[in-house]
Amino acid sequence: MTNYLLEIGLEEIPAHLVTPSINQLAERMETFLKENRLEFDKIIKFSTPRRLAIIVEGLAEASEAIDEEVKGPSAKIAKDAQGNWSKAIQGFSRGQGATPDDLILKGDYYYAKKHIDGVKAEEILSKVGDEVIAKMTFSTYMKWGNNDFLFVRPIQWIVSLLEDKVVAFDLLDVTANRFSRGHRFLANVEVELKNANDYASKMPENFVLVDAEHRKAEISAQILALASENKWQVTLHKDLLEEVNNIVEYPTAFVGSFDPKYLSVPAEVLVTSMRDNQRYFEVYNQEGQLAPNFISVRNGNAENIENVVLGNEKVLVARLEDAEFFWKEDQKLKIEDLVAKLAKVTFHAKIGSITEHMARTKEIAAKLADIAGLTDEEKRDVARSAEIYKFDLLTGMVGEFDELQGVMGEKYALLAGENANVSAAIREHYMPTSAEGELPETKVGSVLAAADKIDSVLSFFNVGLIPSGSNDPYALRRAVQGLIRIIEKMNWHFDLSLFIDQFEGENHLEILDFVKARIQKLLLEKLDRHDIVEAAINSSNFDITNMMESAFVIDGHKLHEPFKPAIENVSRSINLVKKAKDIKEINPTLFEEDAEEALYNVVISLQNQWTYMPGEEKFRAIVHSLAPAIETFFESVMVMAEDLSVRDNRIALLSEVVALTSVMADFSLINTK
């Protein structure tokens, strides 16, 4: 067994592309080796902004030799009327390097036996350039030189070593060899690698920490040490740490500062300037207050670090000056004046202005407020917030720092005298901002956030701007996913189908399918039974909270003994009712068997309390009360009686069973085998 090193040296890769690129390289190499039957133990990944590298450990010296049988023509066409081999069979055997007489008849077909020799690892790996590297795909490409080759960034060098031997191949004008390169500034020289196994130890000697996880741990340790030394609190934000890790090859953390006068600007603005714009880690004092300092990481050593500190401080001060200016100037503006100007700001060319969007949102929010059971005071807050909630889009601060939309709206609203509920709703209506993002905390904010998302989806669908495939330029999938999470968190129960029917539009069925797909996705991230999820999202009314709850409740009982017979009895009822053309009213006087009366009594009893029962209680009632009564009914009663009135009455009884259970799920979609 041997080890193989492949390193692709590049111009600096954008930070957000480094990790997916190295993952793709490893995956493509794994696929390539398996397709070529070249066994290996594992693939180790290395990455920096300037290189993507893997080491394949435990690589076999050659691919496995195999004997295989290749299926050929049918025996029916193998020979002509005179018993001679047909052209079809001759062509097949020739293509397999055999004669017709060498073929084997198995059943109705002829097969050719074929022996495939093993191929040396070196020969297989010489194809890595064309079969692995050249086939990589990226969201962003670059083209260089006089060719049509595209890659994430121009390739500068390639290392290809099988133990101590170069596995040469050419890619454009680059020939794979044993020479890597050190840090661009600290060791800008060729680094000769004698052996593939020297990579992880040799590169740090040239100021390149190629192990991304080790480099990240080093960055974390340095930042925490500086924070401890200065008695600060610091959070190693996951995304920021990942980004910083992917812009450096040799990290050195340092401390910078800014004038405390800027602390008069809201902390969110300062943090945005540092964290989002400059990739700095903000720090807090022991009381949890933002300190006039930051920690950053340079791509290099500590030499002349004081100049680096000064340069970073200068850049930050320029941003903070702008922030302070906007903070002061925006406070001179009036909310009503800004709201009036929104009439001239386009929401979308096909949809209209932001003012029109806000008006529709206000109407939707009023109806949601009723569903949510808000007080009269809360309803007034919903109405007020819906009238003004986009005003901060026209402030200088949001114009400069668009990440602060909503955040600044809340602050400016409070300064203008709006109450806490209205102000918080302005900030919360953007929530959640990501798949797992924070949800609104207030009732008013939840209603406004949901209403804003509903109008966005309705509006874009109504003008035909519907997401397709992976294309979703208006983030409607994210909006719907956020809507689902808000509705579930707030435990709102309403039929979305009936709700959106109150508003204009012709694509409501498409919208419901779109929402249903998002519910399915959310559920399948946590549950492994597709059939249970499918059953829950196909309940008889489009109650999102009910769908989510039902899926988890049913899934929680799937291993219990009564689960299978209960589902089967309910499913049998559903299937019989589906076949019926006309459902009559139940007439208890037509009952002929005790089992009919018993099932009827169970149904009536459950109907009286069904609306108010939690999902867990509903399912227990189905399993322990309804299903046994259904089973006895089927054992004692011939549903398809000769007397049509009796038959119709029994179908009507089963239809009530279906109506009851389908509120929770379509149980006929659950697999019990």
UniProtKB/Swiss-Prot annotation:
The keyword Ligase applies. The keyword Cytoplasm applies. One of its GO terms (cellular component) is cytosol. It is found in: Cytoplasm. It holds the Pfam family tRNA_synt_2f. Keywords: Aminoacyl-tRNA synthetase, ATP-binding, Cytoplasm, Ligase, Nucleotide-binding, Protein biosynthesis. Its main location: cytoplasm. GO terms for molecular function: ATP binding; glycine-tRNA ligase activity. One of its GO terms (biological process) is glycyl-tRNA aminoacylation. It catalyses: tRNA(Gly) + glycine + ATP = glycyl-tRNA(Gly) + AMP + diphosphate. Its EC number is 6.1.1.14. Belongs to the class-II aminoacyl-tRNA synthetase family. Tetramer of two alpha and two beta subunits. This is Glycine--tRNA ligase beta subunit. It comes from Lactococcus lactis subsp. lactis (strain IL1403).
